């Protein structure tokens, strides 16, 4: 059984173009690696500045020059603490303009401005984007209609409307790109984050009838640790035991 159906398979072209670009970039950096001078703080500041390309914060300085929704969501609060509010807002405007133009929110935007999902539609793309918008106080009014359409699409695509949980029968892209899991704890934590962030925002919130802290504890907590997914296999997964506390 394929981890995702033919109907949800993303286009092949972005894989080919991005794969070739990353391969060439990786080869170049092995031959001519860039070295930074200074102490740890100075080096980190230089890397952050190199990740700002004038249009958006790219994920890394070399191989991953794309915009990644998840990675940016992880970094948004820290970037704000480091006084990069202007660049954060410009990155969000860049991403939202391209998402709106292509009628979808995705995991990734190529350096050429084309959104695509790797490897398929991800549960955490919309939650991390909304989180970045909220914590940065980005003025999203002009994108409200588009965001509400994406929230509605997310709810119908991802959520079992009887349980409130991520549909276990569908494989979605996630923090572990190719891992096949059944409604993972991490994915449901992302839905919980989305439900929480939508409160107080002038956006639709179809999740407000569910109590996600209670659902996650009931379905994943075994008294000692959180299960990785609804399969309840007896191993401890790092993401499953980090994000419930985030």
Regions found by a protein language model. Give the residues of each.
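Catalytic cores of carbohydrate-active enzymes
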Residues: 102-108, 162-173, 180-246
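Solvent-exposed loop and edge beta-strand segments that line ligand/cofactor-binding
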Residues: 2-23, 56-73, 80, 110-127, ...
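Well-ordered alpha-helical scaffold segments within catalytic/enzyme domains
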Residues: 18-32, 73-85, 127-142, 189-204, ...
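Long hydrophobic alpha-helices with heptad-repeat/coiled-coil character
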Residues: 39-43, 47, 51-62, 139-169
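Generic alpha-helical secondary structure signal
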Residues: 34, 38, 42, 86, ...
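Generic beta-strand structural signal
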Residues: 52, 99, 159, 220-221
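Aromatic-rich carbohydrate-recognition surfaces in CAZymes
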Residues: 65-162, 188
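Low-complexity, Ser/Thr/Pro/Gly-enriched N-terminal "stalk/linker" regions
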Residues: 2-67, 89-90, 94, 103-104, ...
């Amino acid at each position: 059984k394929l981890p995702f159906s033919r109907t949800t398979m993303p286009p092949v072209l972005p894989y080919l173009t991005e794969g070739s670009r990353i391969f060439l970039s990786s080869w170049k950096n092995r031959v001519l690696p860039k070295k930074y001078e200074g102490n740890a703080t100075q080096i980190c500041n230089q890397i952050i500045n190199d990740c700002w390309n004038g249009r958006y914060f790219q994920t890394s300085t070399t191989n991953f020059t794309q915009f990644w929704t998840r990675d940016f969501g992880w970094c948004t609060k820290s970037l704000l603490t480091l006084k990069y509010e202007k660049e954060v807002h410009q990155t969000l405007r860049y991403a939202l303009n391209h998402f709106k133009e292509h009628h979808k929110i995705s995991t990734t935007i190529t350096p050429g401005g084309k959104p695509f999902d790797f490897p398929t539609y991800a549960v955490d793309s919309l939650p991390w984007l909304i989180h970045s918008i909220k914590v940065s106080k980005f003025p999203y009014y002009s994108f409200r209609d588009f965001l509400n359409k994406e929230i509605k699409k997310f709810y119908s695509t991802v959520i079992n409307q009887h349980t409130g949980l991520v549909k276990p029968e569908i494989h979605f892209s996630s923090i572990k790109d190719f891992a096949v899991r059944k409604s993972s704890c991490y994915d449901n934590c992302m839905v919980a984050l989305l439900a929480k962030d939508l409160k107080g925002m002038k956006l639709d919130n179809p999740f407000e009838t569910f109590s996600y802290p209670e659902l996650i504890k009931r379905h994943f907590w075994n008294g000692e640790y959180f299960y990785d997914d609804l399969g309840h296999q007896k191993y401890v997964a790092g993401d499953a035991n980090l994000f419930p506390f985030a």
